[in-house]
Amino acid sequence: MLRKLTPLALALLPLVAGQTIGETPEVHPKLPTWKCSNRHGCVKQDTSVVIDAATHWIHEKGGETSCTGSSGPNPNLCPDKETCAANCVIEGISDYANYGVQTKGSSMTLHQYLRDGNTTKSVSPRVYLLAEDGENYEMLQLLNQEFTFDVDVSTLVCGMNGALYFSEMQRDGGRSELNPAGAARGTGYCDAQCFNIPWINGEANVEGAGACCNEMDIWEANARATGYTPHPCNITQLYECSGAECEANGVCDKPGCGFNPYALGAHDFYGYDLEVDTTKPMTVVTQFYTKDNTTTGALVEIRRLYVQNGHVIQNAVVSVDGESVDSITADYCADPSSAFNRLGGLQRMGEALGRGMVLAFSVWNDAGSFMSWLDGGNSGPCNATEGDPALIEKLHPDTHVTFSNIRWGDIGSTYRGKRR
């Protein structure tokens, strides 16, 4: 919906744009990636990452008062979006290591905690992949393609989640007169959980809306459990929800239709010294097959495989309703009462992958449920309390995840390994 501004507000927009970006420079850590094809091999891209806008210092122009309050934008500085843009400055970040992000070559490590003198602080970074121009997000279109990365989860204990996923954010991060920084400062985040966040597309969320969009979780994991999950929505790109639209029966599928080997009965497949051995780095491959095997066809299957020690490891084969299953298909997600199917299922998820999605990386833990939905109870081997963030901070302050060698392209073009 277009907003109507008064002539005075329109006159101020160029001034607002000039005031919004602070003086501290933004230095994006380099993280090269590769685009691959069966015909031409893999071509290196000079890509980089940017940390989420909310991690940046957003403060009063000419002062140090934060523009973010305890439950949203500071109401004194941000009574409305236009006033907020005039009052507030978003600073750059010149050293991402201070926020738990370290890159070296084609590798990136995300730390949950940092030592600061005699204290430990939680930083829990979330970053997005920028295109070679450094101003816009890299948009990945993955229908009838595969996405591959190497990962080391060996220090991610119970209760941790080193995540890699796709979000249907806007390419420019919602760059506008009120948000001239855009993707270059990490604006525009959204996902299928439709969270009420202080800033939506870089503008003050004074209405308390939720930021919704299609989400494809490629990798949610620690050393004890893993899952991959499509979360379709019945909207495109970032949608500002309100009321019931943001809830369980709203515009997005919050639980999704996931594949967690442990939850499906394969208890000896993934973990310490198991078939996929999490004490060692591994290669993770996710393939998006279409009905007609073209990059414009309907998504019909999301397949997973691993490569470790030079050998290809097929995904765990599990039994669901008496059928052997090792991938996500319409039959696997067949529950007609699920939000997944109500909102369009694989068809809708595929449409988002066809339009293009932004790659996000994060590391986090969960004070509410101790990440038990991922690695406890029926979902994994972790007990009810060991995922407590207070316990993790005390016993495992160096917990981190390392992602590297990110590539995508034609199916079969991004990995090598011997079949067992």
UniProtKB/Swiss-Prot annotation:
EC number(s) stated in the UniProt entry for this protein: 3.2.1.4
Enzyme active site: E215 (nucleophile), E220 (proton donor)
Pfam family of the protein (one): Glyco_hydro_7
Annotated signal peptide: 1-18
Catalysis: reaction(s): Endohydrolysis of (1->4)-beta-D-glucosidic linkages in cellulose, lichenin and cereal beta-D-glucans
Keywords, comma-separated and alphabetical: Carbohydrate metabolism, Cellulose degradation, Glycoprotein, Glycosidase, Hydrolase, Polysaccharide degradation, Secreted, Signal
Glycan attachment residues as annotated in the record: N118, N234, N293, N383
Molecular function terms from GO: cellulase activity
Protein function: Has endoglucanase activity on substrates containing beta-1,4 glycosidic bonds, like in carboxymethylcellulose (CMC), hydroxyethylcellulose (HEC) and beta-glucan. Involved in the degradation of complex natural cellulosic substrates.
Name this polypeptide is given: Probable endo-beta-1,4-glucanase celB
